[in-house]
Amino acid sequence: MTSNALYELFRRRLPRAPVNTVMFLTRRTRDGFCGRLTSIATNSHYTMFVLDHGSVRIERPSQSEVDCASLMETLKRIRLRNSWVASEDELDVSRGDA
């Protein structure tokens, strides 16, 4: 499956609207674990990051691979910094959170 087709599938099937990236990262930095990155899909305009098998999705304009790498590094830093807040096996993203 091409990334464009995967992006369209995620966009149609994931139940929630995308969350604001800045608000999500700010809240997670303050409050704790951000969940596991489970998928990335892209089309010609946007890149979608899916966390915890669809509990949260983040969409960003597809500008460059550097943008994607910087978001992934931020997610890793949050995960390491807040590893004491939630265990690896816990899903931190609640249904009413996003």
UniProtKB/Swiss-Prot annotation:
Belongs to the HHV-5 UL19 protein family. It comes from Human cytomegalovirus (strain AD169). It comes from the Viruses. It holds the Pfam family DUF5500. The lineage of its organism: Viruses, Duplodnaviria, Heunggongvirae, Peploviricota, Herviviricetes. This is Uncharacterized protein UL19.
